[in-house]
């Protein structure tokens, strides 16, 4: 972190800044850096060996027994910090905030996980710090069916990130792991409400970070169960920067889903040209949710977002689901608005059902139902939930995506072109995944695919390579071989 110096009486005024480094895995360390090297410890200072308390869960501090933490405010609960790794420092008003990957969950009634960001605040880049609590839990905590407890609705592994003010709105950036796979990290962003006062932390000043909802009371979203457990971190949604809701009249892949009753069904994709991450092997009772669709539209450009038209009477809005059946039996997908249950906790409304006939082709197919009665008068933003229903116990379908259409706006599922490569007129296998990065190949992107063709023994003629694509707009360039060696 760079602390810029503007006070003439500061000893570093002539240099203009102070630099700090923060590091550590399951142990927090920090140091002031030499401004001349920007990597070594500043002369006259030392590495802080135990900067913030690290832990797995409350009551399990990883630090040595009887260690002191001079960079934590006296009286703070050392077990509330739970540092894991990945510090990021921001200045907010007259205070400093450190964001880090930490263990959370028991503080709001869930199991402990480092799939969360936490924060602390202080008067300097080196504290001393007071714990602010959880910033975001990528496991997507929400109420269970009857509101008696909180539950997770996404898989967990770990997360890293920070916060930033953009166009007057604060956001938290983090990542979540499809099906809990730590090497598949889906980038996420959510709006937050940041509040601070002018008092120094040493005199009782605070920084508070809560989930932001432009349509909620006081613009604050929260999830609190009937036992009093409350998750105050950012809400995990499908929106990204579109905090007034997604434009309903577009296609959204299964990768946008943010509520999964079974976190194992979310897959990932190596294809950088395909904004697609399928949900597979959906079974009876599985719930898939998207939060939120901006049925009320956005009447003018705001916060860097372009205005869009929502639903309205006369649109004859239809709901479109793109799925591939995996059974020869019939099954249903129930479509719910606001919640997957019609009870006091969720207040959901079933707006239709998609019936997939027996013996349907096991390929991605578009199914459409009229939902205009339920959505063409809505304002603000609302969630959509899919609930699978069948007498079968096995896999029912794979979900590709969904979206709404109207009598004026059609929906088209984007399909990435398929490339066919032939050698001497014989098709060869094109791999589904790109070349992986290794220490020897130096490849850092995911845009190179390698297909191999082994010449038959005794081949003397130079082979001819041809290629084509299902989309004529794909440009094909071939450099033919000049020899067989």
Task: List the predicted regions and their residue ranges.
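Carbohydrate-active catalytic/glycan-binding domains of CAZyme proteins
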Residues: 1-355, 359-411
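Beta-rich interaction/scaffold domains
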Residues: 409-485
């Amino acid at each position: 972190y760079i602390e810029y110096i503007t006070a003439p009486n500061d000893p570093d005024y002539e240099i203009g800044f102070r630099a700090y480094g923060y590091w550590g895995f399951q142990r927090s360390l920090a140091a002031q850096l030499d401004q001349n090297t920007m990597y070594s410890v500043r002369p006259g200072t030392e590495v802080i060996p135990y900067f913030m308390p690290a832990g797995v869960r409350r009551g399990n501090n990883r630090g040595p027994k009887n260690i002191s933490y001079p960079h934590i405010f006296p009286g703070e609960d050392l077990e509330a910090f739970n540092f894991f790794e990945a510090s990021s420092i921001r200045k907010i008003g007259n205070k400093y905030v450190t964001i880090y990957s930490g263990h959370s969950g028991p503080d709001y009634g869930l199991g402990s996980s480092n799939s969360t960001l936490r924060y602390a605040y202080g008067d300097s880049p080196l504290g001393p710090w007071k714990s602010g609590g959880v910033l975001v839990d990528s496991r997507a905590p929400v109420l269970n069916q009857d509101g008696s407890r909180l539950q997770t609705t996404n898989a967990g592994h770990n997360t890293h990130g920070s916060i930033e003010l953009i166009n007057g709105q604060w956001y938290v950036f983090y990542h979540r792991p499809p099906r809990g796979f730590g090497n598949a990290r889906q980038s996420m962003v959510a709006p937050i409400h940041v509040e601070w006062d002018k008092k120094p932390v040493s005199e009782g000043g605070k920084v508070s970070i809560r989930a932001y909802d432009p349509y909620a009371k006081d613009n604050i979203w929260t999830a609190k169960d009937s036992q009093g457990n409350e998750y105050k971190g950012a809400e995990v949604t499908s929106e990204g920067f579109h905090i007034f809701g997604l434009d309903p009249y577009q296609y959204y892949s299964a990768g946008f889903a943010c509520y999964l009753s079974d976190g194992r069904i979310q897959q990932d994709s190596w294809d950088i040209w395909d904004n697609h991450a399928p949900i597979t092997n959906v079974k009876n009772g599985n719930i898939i949710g998207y939060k939120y669709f901006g049925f009320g539209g956005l009447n003018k450009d705001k916060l860097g977002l372009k205005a869009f038209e929502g639903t309205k009477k006369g649109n004859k809005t239809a709901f479109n689901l793109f799925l591939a059946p995996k059974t020869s039996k019939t099954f249903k997908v129930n479509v719910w608005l606001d919640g997957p249950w019609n009870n006091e906790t969720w207040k959901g409304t079933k707006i239709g059902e998609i019936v997939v006939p027996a013996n349907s082709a096991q390929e991605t197919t578009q199914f459409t139902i009229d939902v205009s009665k339920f959505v063409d008068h809505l304002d603000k933003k609302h969630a959509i939930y899919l609930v699978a229903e069948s007498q079968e116990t096995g896999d029912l379908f794979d979900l590709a995506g969904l979206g709404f259409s109207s009598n004026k706006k059609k929906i088209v599922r984007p399909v990435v072109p398929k490339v066919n490569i032939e050698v001497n007129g014989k098709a060869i296998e094109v791999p589904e995944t790109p070349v992986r990065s290794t220490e020897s190949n130096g490849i850092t992107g995911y845009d190179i695919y390698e297909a191999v063709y082994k010449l038959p023994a005794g081949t003397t003629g130079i082979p001819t390579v041809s290629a084509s694509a299902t989309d004529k707009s794909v440009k094909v360039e071939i450099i033919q071989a000049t020899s067989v060696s």
